[in-house]
Amino acid sequence: MMEKINKQVAFLFSSSILFIAVSLLFVSCGQAGKAHTDTPTSGVTTIGSDDSYTPTVNAEIQVFQALYKAAAIHVKYEPEDSLFKGLMKDSLQVIVAGRKLTTQEETYFKDKQLFPEQVKIATDAIAILVNNDNPDTMLTMDKIKAIFNGDSTWDSPGKGKITVVFDHENSGNSRYIRENLMKGSKFPTYCFALNSNPQVIDYVSKNKGALGIIGVNWVSNDYDSATVGFLNKAKVVYVSLTNGGQHFQPYQYYIKTGDYPLCRDVYMIKTEPYMGLGSGFLSFVTSDKGQRIIFHEGILPATVPTHIISF
């Protein structure tokens, strides 16, 4: 009887070894030509980010690389549309964007047996800028919606026509406006795109009738000399959710309370199928240290307290 049991155990053991060996063979075949030399804290990788989050992403990378000397993270700052295309083409495996994957995109990855990790890292806001000489610094949501649906005149007498400028035609900023204020319709002819958030700030500073749309991260850290320079070039508009209601600027605190109406969540999305440098960087950004960097940058971190920064 014992001999029979021993033979059964031996058979099960040898079968398990065979199964593991075959599984490893399939994995190695699937990874053929994809030898990975990076680890969560070393090596070289390239991630993608919407230009709206450049200050925060740069700050995160600077601290991460200071902690892990063997790590080098490069960034492609691209329009949101290009980031998701890169993710689907596998030219990018980690991105920072103002939206999650769509159902169609999730299905695409599922069909490829990939299950992306989508992690909320922060909440930021759309900031509206006007020229320093423009007295119209308080707008209602009704007025903002009207501007993007054909009303091209400033309320103040003598201010003339409005010109609206974005960072990029396919950026997260322009998508947010289309989806939330325009019901997906096309931009009016007096709206046009530049190539970056700093270009928007510069344009507004030189054109009295301009209204600029940027990610608030570019003007949210008043400890940063570049931010102070931007804030000297243009004014950040106060926005009221209702007519006759209180107006708020996109301070970190008012993003948290929801009093400032033009807010959105920020996500890191990872398709990296192994524990590489992209995975390590995502873990860092979501850690206490990484979240405190976001806090310091003036947008709302997912997990730590907030304060008011005066523009």
Model regions: which residues?
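Bacterial Sec-dependent N-terminal signal peptides
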Residues: M1-T46, F311
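Exported/periplasmic ABC-transporter solute-binding proteins
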Residues: C29-K69, I73-K76, E80-D81, K85-M88, ...
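Pocket-flanking alpha-helical
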Residues: D81-K112, D222
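Periplasmic N-terminal soluble interaction domains immediately after the signal peptide in Gram-negative
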Residues: Q113-E117
